[in-house]
Regions:
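Class I Rossmann-like S-adenosyl-L-methionine
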Residues: 1-242
Length: 242
């Protein structure tokens, strides 16, 4: 993120350090929004599955399978814990947009999941444990959400800030799934936006020093790359070294 904002600082020509710093932290907050939003997607998929079950039961002449469906997916213990998570609920309460706004996407993704061997094997298994339920979602996330071009386009349409964030945020979501512990209930900690105040201050310091000490750092780069023609080095590479 710091590299992106430093690069933009030089490219847009405004050279307003305070405004650029504000943009850095806004960009980081949007990445954290995406983290929460992707956690919400797993709940949305489960809610859609329940909706399908309810609609099938409400038919005039439902089949026995529709009246007595396999409830294993919608009663997944990991999702039951996630949907009452206090931190996630706080985030959701402040959001105007939910996955209900993109139900067509949720429907299409759910249908791909249902057609998969991962889903079929889970539903057919007699094992009923929190660990198996959590592992199901780790596999589903990695297979259907991690590298999903349709989802990438949808997210980019919602926020330009999410264009380059998803790949790294996906790793945070997978880490979160792995860390969930049943005994923590609704108080399971999610990953924080910053590890601590010192972590946030480090980002600010690194950003400011990269810009304020630009001349000195470029001199060092030049001194240590005498065999290079710096004018021919990609500007992004110069920013990274800086």
């Amino acid at each position: 993120k710091i590299i992106q904002i430093v690069y933009a600082y030089y490219q847009n020509g405004s050279k307003n350090l305070d405004a650029a710093e504000k943009e850095l932290f806004f960009s980081l907050s949007k990445a954290y929004d995406l983290y929460n939003y992707l956690l919400m997607l797993m709940i949305a998929l489960t809610n859609y599955a329940q909706k399908r079950i309810d609609a099938a039961k409400a038919k005039l002449a439902p089949t026995a399978e529709e009246l007595y469906p396999n409830m294993k997916f919608v009663e997944n213990k990991f999702i039951s814990q996630l949907e009452v998570n206090r931190q996630l609920m706080d985030f959701i309460s402040n959001q105007k947009r939910t996955w209900e706004n993109d139900e067509d996407f949720v429907k299409g993704l759910f249908e791909k999941i249902v057609a998969s061997d991962i889903y079929k094997e889970y539903m057919a298994s007699s094992e009923s444990s929190y660990e198996a339920d959590r592992e199901l979602w780790r596999k589903l996330y990695k297979t259907f959400i991690f590298n999903n071009e349709e989802l990438d386009i949808l997210l980019e349409d919602q926020s330009l800030y999410w264009n380059d964030d998803k790949e790294i945020v996906d790793t945070f979501v997978l880490k979160t799934i792995k860390r969930f512990d049943e005994k923590n209930g609704a108080n399971q900690p999610l990953l924080p936006e910053f590890k601590d105040d010192e972590d946030q201050e480090f980002a600010r310091r690194l950003f400011r020093r990269a810009i304020l000490n630009c001349d000195y750092y470029r001199h060092l780069i030049s001194e240590n790359t005498r065999n290079w023609d710096l004018d021919r080095v990609a500007f992004m590479d110069v920013v990274i070294m800086q």
